[in-house]
């Protein structure tokens, strides 16, 4: 695709096009990182301060630049086409979608698929090999069910969903529209509910269900448990990485983002727009307010008010944690000073 066509796409997109130079209007057929890009490939630069050598050595035919990246004269001398935008990551995503179009799956049901009684399948559905769909389940239009997916009874799957190979959707789960469930994820598995008795652990039946809003994405090997009663809810637009555990009865708001190995204990409530970095733990029935950001390995055991940035274990305001972390390595010397002071009293 000619670079000029990509400029038209960016001009109609969300990246905020500022300026561009077509140079020789190169043909762009793929994308790569700056240091590995070759002829007819495109890359992007958010910050040029640490990429001096890569910029000088790149063979890319075109570059997407952040608005503060001032290297256009150098690129002109190298005959490299460029475009400056407010958000180069969005621009890169828009171009990747254009030059790497999504595979189109034909409307079909593989002969090895097993489909139960009273299953309602919408229009333009693709169902791959060895899929198992139990009775009374509904699948919305334009959905893609890859090989090996297991869908239990009484599940509702909205329109335009994609369920990747070997994921499992348990009974009574409800998926909105435009959701993506990646391989080996499990939606609606039994919550971890046991009651201690004199004879050991008594299992609490888990009769609730999981509800996913629209545009939710669940990463590979992540699990979302159903509760004993009621619902586990993940709000619209929320994105969950691989290897994340969402406990029974958890309520997650809209447009949250959770990185790998986050664990959320049963009954916790997460507001809208919350960001949980890798390995964050949220305790049982804890409330995390909207737009909270929790840094990696943060342990949240008490309620967090909205709009806070927290770090550490247990979680404290990030600025306080940074001061504590800066002083941590000084503790042995401080202990010696305190010991001397105590001895002199």
Curated annotation (Swiss-Prot):
Catalytically driven reaction(s): a UDP-3-O-[(3R)-3-hydroxyacyl]-alpha-D-glucosamine + a (3R)-hydroxyacyl-[ACP] = a UDP-2-N,3-O-bis[(3R)-3-hydroxyacyl]-alpha-D-glucosamine + holo-[ACP] + H(+)
Keywords, ordered alphabetically: Acyltransferase, Lipid A biosynthesis, Lipid biosynthesis, Lipid metabolism, Repeat, Transferase
Catalytic site: 248 (proton acceptor)
Gene Ontology terms, MF aspect: N-acyltransferase activity; structural constituent of carboxysome shell
GO biological process entries: lipid A biosynthetic process
Known pathway: Bacterial outer membrane biogenesis; LPS lipid A biosynthesis
GO cellular component annotations of the record: carboxysome; membrane
Record's signal peptide: none
InterPro entries linked: Hexapep (IPR001451), LpxD (IPR007691), Trimer_LpxA-like_sf (IPR011004), UDP_GlcNAc_AcTrfase_non-rep (IPR020573)
The protein's enzyme class: transferase
EC number(s) stated in the UniProt entry for this protein: 2.3.1.191
Cross-referenced Pfam families: Hexapep (PF00132), LpxD (PF04613)
HAMAP family in alphabetical order: LpxD
Family: Belongs to the transferase hexapeptide repeat family. LpxD subfamily.
Role of this protein: Catalyzes the N-acylation of UDP-3-O-acylglucosamine using 3-hydroxyacyl-ACP as the acyl donor. Is involved in the biosynthesis of lipid A, a phosphorylated glycolipid that anchors the lipopolysaccharide to the outer membrane of the cell.
Known partners and oligomeric status: Homotrimer.
Official protein name in the record: UDP-3-O-acylglucosamine N-acyltransferase
Species per Swiss-Prot/TrEMBL record: Prochlorococcus marinus (strain SARG / CCMP1375 / SS120)
Source species taxonomy: Bacteria, Bacillati, Cyanobacteriota, Cyanophyceae, Synechococcales
Gene assigned in the entry: lpxD
């Amino acid at each position: 695709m000619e670079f000029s066509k990509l400029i038209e796409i960016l001009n109609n997109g969300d990246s905020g096009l500022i300026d561009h130079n077509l140079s020789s209007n190169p043909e762009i057929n793929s994308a790569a990182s700056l240091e590995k890009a070759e002829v007819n490939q495109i890359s992007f630069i958010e910050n040029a301060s640490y990429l001096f050598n890569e910029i000088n050595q790149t063979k890319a035919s075109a570059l997407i630049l952040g608005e503060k990246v001032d290297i256009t004269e150098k690129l002109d001398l190298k005959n490299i086409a460029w475009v400056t935008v407010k958000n180069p990551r969005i621009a890169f995503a828009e171009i990747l979608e254009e030059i790497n179009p999504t595979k189109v799956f034909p409307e079909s049901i593989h002969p090895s698929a097993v489909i139960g009684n009273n299953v309602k399948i919408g229009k333009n559905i693709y169902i791959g090999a060895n899929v198992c769909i139990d009775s009374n389940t509904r699948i919305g239009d334009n959905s893609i069910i890859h090989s090996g997916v297991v869908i239990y009874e009484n599940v509702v799957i909205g329109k335009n969903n994609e369920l990747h190979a070997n994921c499992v959707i348990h009974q009574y789960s409800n998926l909105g529209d435009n959701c993506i469930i990646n391989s080996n994820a499990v939606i609606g598995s039994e919550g971890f509910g046991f009651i201690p008795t004199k004879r050991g652990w008594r299992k609490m039946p888990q009769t609730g269900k999981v509800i996913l809003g629209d545009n939710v994405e669940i990463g590979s090997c992540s699990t979302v448990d159903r509760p004993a009663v009621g619902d586990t809810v993940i709000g619209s637009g929320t994105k969950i990485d691989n290897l994340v555990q969402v406990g029974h009865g958890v309520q997650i708001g809209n447009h949250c983002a959770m990185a790998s190995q986050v664990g959320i204990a049963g009954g916790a409530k997460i507001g809208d727009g919350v960001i949980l970095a890798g390995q964050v733990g949220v305790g049982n029935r804890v409330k995390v307010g909207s737009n909270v950001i929790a840094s990696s390995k943060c342990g949240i055991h008490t309620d967090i008010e909205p709009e806070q940035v927290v770090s550490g274990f247990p979680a404290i305001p990030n600025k306080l944690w940074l001061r504590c972390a800066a002083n941590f390595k000084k503790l042995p010397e401080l202990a010696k000073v305190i010991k001397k002071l105590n001895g002199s009293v």
